[in-house]
Amino acid sequence: MSKLGVLLTICLLLFPITALPMDGDQPADRLAERMQDNISSEEHPFEKRQRLCCGFPKSCRSRQCKPHRCCGR
């Protein structure tokens, strides 16, 4: 009986139950969750910063704004 317990312990250590994929871990489910979060590129902080940086001609001279991304260059 103790040999069976040792074998079971070794098997559980080598292949834990947490290694099995669960239903909530599927990529399709994660995509649906991201879509529900309503995070679009319009609301993304990086996009917002880039738009603010390139909003006026005088801001194109700032160090944060790269001229090749805005001001028609």
From Swiss-Prot:
InterPro entries per the UniProt record, alphabetical: Conotoxin, Conotoxin_mu-typ
Tissue: Expressed by the venom duct.
Residues annotated as site: Important for activity: R63
Keywords from the UniProt entry: Amidation, Cleavage on pair of basic residues, Disulfide bond, Hydroxylation, Ion channel impairing toxin, Neurotoxin, Pyrrolidone carboxylic acid, Secreted, Signal, Toxin, Voltage-gated sodium channel impairing toxin
PTM-bearing positions, type Pyrrolidone carboxylic acid: Q50
Post-translational modification remark: 3D-structure of 3 disulfide-bond connectivities isomers is described (PIIIA-1 (C1-C5, C2-C6, C3-C4), PIIIA-2 (C1-C4, C2-C5, C3-C6) and PIIIA-3 (C1-C2, C3-C4, C5-C6)). Only PIIIA-2 contains the cysteine connectivity described as typical for native mu-conotoxins. However, PIIIA-1 is more potent than PIIIA-2, suggesting another possible disulfid connectivity. For this reason, both connectivities have been indicated in features.
Key word DNA repair present: no
A cellular component annotation (GO) from this entry: extracellular region
Function: Mu-conotoxins block voltage-gated sodium channels (Nav). This toxin potently blocks rNav1.4/SCN4A (IC(50)=36-41 nM). It also moderately blocks rNav1.1/SCN1A (IC(50)=120 nM), rNav1.2/SCN2A (IC(50)=620 nM), rNav1.3/SCN3A (IC(50)=3.2 uM), mNav1.6/SCN8A (IC(50)=100 nM). This inhibition is reversible. The block of Nav1.1, Nav1.2, and Nav1.6 is modified when beta-subunits are coexpressed with alpha subunits.
Name of the protein: Mu-conotoxin PIIIA
